[in-house]
Structure formats: structure tokens, C-alpha cells
Amino acid sequence: MSEEKASSPSGKMDGEKPLNPWPEYINTRLDMYHKLKAEHDSILAEKAAKDSKPIKVTLPDGKQVDAESWKTTPYQIACGISQGLADNTVVAKVNKVVWDLDRPLETDCTLELLKFEDEEAQAVYWHSSAHIMGEAMERVYGGCLCYGPPIENGFYYDMYLEEGGVSSNDFSSLETLCKKIIKEKQTFERLEVKKETLLEMFKYNKFKCRILNEKVNTPTTTVYRCGPLIDLCRGPHVRHTGKIKTLKIHKNSSTYWEGKADMETLQRIYGISFPDPKLLKEWEKFQEEAKNRDHRKIGRDQELYFFHELSPGSCFFLPKGAYIYNTLMEFIRSEYRKRGFQEVVTPNIFNSRLWMTSGHWQHYSENMFSFEVEKEQFALKPMNCPGHCLMFDHRPRSWRELPLRLADFGVLHRNELSGALTGLTRVRRFQQDDAHIFCAMEQIEDEIKGCLDFLRTVYSVFGFSFKLNLSTRPEKFLGDIEIWNQAEKQLENSLNEFGEKWELNPGDGAFYGPKIDIQIKDAIGRYHQCATIQLDFQLPIRFNLTYVSHDGDDKKRPVIVHRAILGSVERMIAILTENYGGKWPFWLSPRQVMVVPVGPTCDEYAQKVRQEFHDAKFMVDIDLDPGCTLNKKIRNAQLAQYNFILVVGEKEKASGTVNIRTRDNKVHGERTVGETVERLQQLKQLRSKQAEEEF
């Protein structure tokens, strides 16, 4: 787009039409920007003429390229390697920091050229796409843009509208305008501007002024421009809007400013974009598959669980859902027994003094349900670790007791904003397979190996593969650097001995200790973080936890390992529901066996068979509907995902047998009731993933 004052296009579209003329703030903002840009270009030209000097740019393969500071850009270096590389590069990474391709290099540096496949490049690509959509939203609605970040799959932009709202009927109009913006190849320009100047530029938008006043603690910050849109933004961005090859707007909702229910209501529009239309087709197919697997739909259809407005964010587990919940906990309990964990029960409500000691009151009290009792402040616990510290501390401890592994399925509550609640994945009431290991420094390596083996055992039963990342000391860490180094070395040794591939995530640990991040991959390729293995050097200090060491030192400080495998049981049930698409493996299935009598004369025998399976602790039902044909009963049981369907007729009644088939219509034929019970008990005990095939 030329540097002239923006003028509005006209044209008829579905839904809302672009405004004509555009809101006055767009032109006022552009006028200010042009003056600032001219000053910036003049300063940069002077710097390039005066301060430019030869620099060395080191590529990932170690090769060095000659360049000039304040003149050479990453894009020029990419072109020097190959035009194809330059065209396919989304963003640069200079000295490990993402960097605009057209921003001049300033000193000797390392340079990486990131393509769309890289996660950081995807975030930049989707962030730039959000700006394209933001430009279209300003031109169609004329409201005040708020936040417009990239998210895990795509991007969104929030807008404040004085009146009216956004309708899905507007998507076509917005997409058409986005395509026009893309076709214009509007350049993304970066400008560093004084805070007070930006307060003047954005005086029409109270939300941008709030960001400047409350979040920007430096004298200057950056804005980015594409076409008529100028927005507060750290960047970086793609070179121009033409780099976005295909863009789809697919969802809208309302939300609150910064998620706070007492703040303004905003309109949120979601989009997705890709550098290849084929990727969009794949994404659409994936969305359809994910929609069919949505745990909220399956939970409703299979009568597993539901939510009610009278207790937002707290799930009601129906009998069949409760079976899944309890079976998961029993699975973990059985592993606890093998692995030396001791299960404990701790209070749900604690005096706020506990949370002040732990540090949660200072940093987390907004997310806690708190109330007054006899002029004292209490809160429902959002996590178990402080309670476990009290358990460790309730009597003197000896080195002989270490490692002490305390496990807790206690009910936890977190005061999530109502707008953030999403099925079982974001709740207020939940339970975790939570455990804390109190150990000596030299025991860390063995304990971490045990935790890793534990998670491999559990995830292999579910059929999940997983990714491991070691997150090490951040810049702002607490404690002795030697202790950190020793602990990180032990974590590294544990991971190497574990034998699975892992990656280093330097500087991404918590301030109180390094951690191992674990992501599981589900049946449709999505990654979820559930397990936690986190070292904590600070909580033992806060609670003044000590033990008597073997040399008699009674002030030895333990280390705490926070660990969970399922994480939130509720969230794991959501993931498993979607992973299996409601087709539960036999051991976890809430519908394991359906007994189907051929006709009314076999009903009594069918009832006896059902009772035998019930007594053997199977989830068993019987279909005695006289209005259904045999084939219809079998089909209904298969559609309801009963793992095994036991047909009983006169022949089976006479011989004390059942005729077995599976939900996938594999026929196993006739077996005695006793044999069938015994075999199914074996498969259940083995937690077989393919019990129907293995029968």
C-alpha cells in the first residue's frame, strides 16, 4: 500500500460490509506514523553511514558469512545462500532471539533461518496473520482492537465494540478483505517509539493505553505497521502480508478484558493460516475428526459425565464415568504399591498462614477459593505440596526414612474464571495423582529414574508416545548455583539412562528448581502436557524442613520432587475420551459386556449369566427389550461400544455357554460362562489394549 492517507474500498459482501469512510482514528494514526517513520529512517541511514562496520555472521553449520552492521539483513544473507531458502524462510533467529528478516543486523551474531515447520516460526506466521485479520476487523467494525496473539493452533483478535457484536455471517466478508490485504503484499514495518508518543497515537483506544500504562516499563516500545493498521507489538513478523498463502476465519466468541468478569465484554474472532492450501485442507479434516471426538459430546452420548450451571467447572460423574475415574485411580494405586509410595489423606481447607509460608498466598491467592471463619482467613487447597510439608515436619525425620514418597488423591479447587472453563480440560474442582518425594540430594538421580519408569509404564498402557524436555536454571533463580548444577547433572544422567530421546530447554526451569516437561501424543497427533517431574529446593527452606543425616547432622535439608503422571484425573479422562473416540479399551471400558438373549424364553438364563459377570466385577448390562430383533440388539450394543456381546439362545442355555462376538463383529464362538469369565479377567488384569482381538 502507498504512503498516502488510507482510503476505504467499497463493494458488497455477505454479512457486515467494510466501513466507508473508515474510522477517523485510522487516518490520524497513519499521519503520526508517517512522521515517526521518516525520522526513524533518517536516523537509521545516518547510523548505517557512520557506524557500519564489517561483522561475522555464524550459520548453524558453523560457516561464517561476512556482513555489515546496520545494513545487512537476514533476508539478504538467505538470498546469498539460495532464493528458494529466502522465499521459504518465515523469520530469522539472531543470537537465539527471533528477528525480522528485513531488520538490519547490529553486531557479530549467530543466525538461524526458520521455516514454517519450526514452532517459533509458526507463532510468528500466525501472529502476522492476526494483524491481517485485525486490519480487516478495524475496516469492517471500526472498534478498538485489544490483544491479538498467536495460539497453539492459529490466532485470534479481541475487539471492543460500543454496540452490536460479531456474527459468523461476517466471516465471509472478513475473509474476502483478508485476501485483498494478502494480495496487496503490505510490508510489515517495525518502529521503536517513545511511550508518551504512543499514548497520544492510541488515545482513541483505552485498552492500548492501559497496556502502555500498566505493562510497558521501558521509555520506548515497538509498534508494527501493515497497510493502515498500526499496533502495539513486540514482533517479529513475516516480511509482507503476501507470505500468508491461505487464511480461514472459523470461530467467534465473547470474552472479558484480560479474562476478568467485572471488565468490559470483548468480541473475539479466531483464525488459522498456512503457507500451503494443502495444509489448510488437512487442518479442516483434522478439525472434523477432533469435533467427532470431542469429549463433551462423547461424555453426553455415553452418559459418562456432565456439567451444571449450579456448580460451574465441577463435573458430575455418572456411574459409568465414575467407573473410568476410579479405575484410573486404582491403576495408579497398584503402581504406588509396587514402587514404594505411601498414600495419605490431607485436609481440604487450610488457614491462610499455610499459604503465606508456602508463598502461594502472595502469588496465587486470586486463584484460590477463600473465606473467613471466626475472623481468620481460610482457603480450599489448590495443590497438595504444602500439606505434605506439614506431614514431613510433624515429627523429627531420619536419613533412614528417605526417600519418603507421599501420594495424595485429595480434591483440589482452583478459582478459574468462568469464561475459561472448558469441559474437563479446564475445571475448578479436580483430583490429581499427586505425589511428593522427600529425598537427599544424592538420591535425586535414582528417584527421577523411578519417576520416568513410572510414566513409561502408565503411558504404554494407554498407547501414548511422549516427548521429554529438560528445563534448566532460569536467569532469576533462587538458591545455590552449585546445588542447581549438581541437580541438573543428576536429571541429565537419569534421562540418558532412561534411554528415550530428550531435548534440552535451557533457562526454562522454575525459579525454585529444574524440571522435566513431558508431552504425550494422542491418536490424532495432538500433544498434551499431563505428567510433571519438578525439583524444588525452596519449599523445604520455606517450611524449614530438616532431617538427621547419617553423620548426625540434624539440620540437613531435603529436596522435594513434585510428580504426577495423569496430572488432573479430569483432564486425563478428557484426553483419553478423545484419544479413543469413545472406543474404550476393555480394562477401562464402562461398557465391557452386553448379554443378549435370543428370545424371551432365554431371559432367565441371560439374567443368570449377567449376574455371574457382575459378581466377577465386570461392567455388564443385559438387553431384554422384546421389541428388538436379535440383530438390532447386537447392532445397538456394538454402536454403544460394548467390548464383548454375549448372545444366549436355547443351545447356550442347555450347555451353560455363551456365544461371543466383539463390537467390531469379530466372532469368537461358543465358550462356557466360566471360561469366558476367567479369560476376560486375565485380559482386564493385563490391561490389554486389544482384548477383543486377543480373546
Curated annotation (Swiss-Prot):
What is the name attached to this protein's record? Threonine--tRNA ligase 1, cytoplasmic
Phosphothreonine modifications at: T218, T425
Please cite one Gene Ontology biological process associated with this protein.
threonyl-tRNA aminoacylation
Give the Enzyme Commission number. Answer: 6.1.1.3
Q: Where are the transmembrane segments?
A: none
Q: How does it assemble?
A: Homodimer.
Lineage at the top is:
Eukaryota, Metazoa, Chordata, Craniata, Vertebrata
Keyword terms, alphabetized: Acetylation, Aminoacyl-tRNA synthetase, ATP-binding, Cytoplasm, Ligase, Nucleotide-binding, Phosphoprotein, Protein biosynthesis, Ubl conjugation
The UniProt similarity line reads: Belongs to the class-II aminoacyl-tRNA synthetase family.
What function does this protein fulfil?
Catalyzes the attachment of threonine to tRNA(Thr) in a two-step reaction: threonine is first activated by ATP to form Thr-AMP and then transferred to the acceptor end of tRNA(Thr). Also edits incorrectly charged tRNA(Thr) via its editing domain, at the post-transfer stage.
